[in-house]
Amino acid sequence: MKNKNWPIVLEYAESIRSGKKIACEELKQAVERFFRDLENPDYWMDYKSAEFCIQIIENTLCHQQGEKMDGTPLRGSPFLLEPYQKFILYNLVGLKLADTNIVKYHEALIFVPRKNGKTGLAAALAWSLSLLYRKSGSKCYIASAALMQSLESFNFLNYNVNRMGENAKDGGAVKVIDNNNEHSMESTLEDGMFYIRALAANPDAQDSLNCNIAITDRFCPVYW
C-alpha cells in the first residue's frame, strides 16, 4: 500500500478532534492546525517523504532495551512507531510549502512522559532524517546537558548499525568512531552522505557547528 500509514495518522487525529481520545489542549490545537493545513492551498502533503522516514525506522531499527507493558523483552524486536509518532513525522516532513520541496516546520518541541521512549524517538528521528536528506549531504548533531545522555541515542544507533552488519570494520557502509575523543558515524552513499555525532552541551565551543539537523535530548526540539 503506497501510503499505508496515512490512514493511521488520520484516525489518530480524528480521534482527538472528536473527543474519543483524551488529549491536552496543546495536542487538540496541534490536531486542529493539522486539519487546517490539509485544506490550505499554501501547503501540500508529501506522503513519500513521511512514509520513507516511517518505513526506514520500522524496517531498519530495533529496540536496544526495554519491555512491553506485560513484561515481554523488547531487545532485538522491530522499533514500531505509535500512531502519535507517525502523526509527528507526517507533520514534520510531510507538510511542505506549495510548489516547493521546503517543509513547513523547521522546529519541533515534543513533550513525552518519562519512560515512554523519548531517547529512542530522538535517535530514530536522527537516523531517518539523516537518510532522507542524504542527497544534500546531511549532518546531524545530538546534544544533551551531559554527554552520557547524548550517548543513549548514539549507542542505540550504534547497536543497530552493528546488528545490521553495516559497521565499516565488518565490511559495511557506515564508519563509526566511538572513543574518548569522538562519538560519530558517517557514510558516503551512491546518492549522498550523512554524518551523525553525539555531543555534550558546551556553548563556548559549539557556536560554529554547521548542521541541517539538531536534536537536543531531554529538551527534545528538532531543527533542520
List where the protein language model places each region:
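Phosphate/NTP-binding elements of NTP-utilizing enzymes
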Residues: M1-W224
